[in-house]
């Protein structure tokens, strides 16, 4: 009630609403959004200090920014219907984005958790990952370990080691795998180096002709693909031949696995949807 016992009018109520300056006078949803922004910001700072999970740190900062934008729109929505409409559009767009990315993430996880390493194959492709100078990264080391186990279990099949030399690498990914596998007793005659590829599409495209020279039937053979689980969905998406693929996933530590699975869903949406639209 206003002085004199008069109830506040609509304009006066609007002015009162906009004067809710303190945190505890905000709507409950606004307080929750502000707390989430702070949590995501602190989480991002913490994750950025850990090796190998940089994407999760950046994603946390991105989520903090989204929360701040939604908070700002929520506060401004009290001023006019235009701001309220913009808030609704942002909320609907965010919900659609989350649902779409969640669907992609479920598909990536399901593809990555199929382990067929006990099944035989006619040939092998080991996909490269980063090299720190001449030392294999954690991801590449796990692929080398998986390749060693599979090649020792199937001693009569050839393998292409696929991966070029990127920035900051003193040797190609293929050569790093070759050196490690031969040091562990794998016959070098079985190993074929493919050192030109810079991405997964090139890995597959450049490796197949090398296997065909060894007698591999790309239209009827069974091809074992060794890479990390998060990578398997992309391999299946890019592979367009009737060759039966045998998935041999290399195991990462759980915290790296979670980071790479998150990153992969965004990368697939970027490569398969956004990039073709913007090209």
Predicted regions and their residues:
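A transmembrane-helix-recognition feature enriched in membrane-embedded lipid enzymes
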Residues: 258-277
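Short juxtamembrane and helix-loop transition motifs at transmembrane-helix boundaries
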Residues: 20-26
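A structural signal for short, hydrophobic/glycine-enriched beta-strand patches
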Residues: 102-262
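Perimembrane helix-loop junctions in membrane proteins
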Residues: 78, 108-115, 274-278
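Membrane-embedded alpha-helical segments of integral membrane proteins
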Residues: 28-77
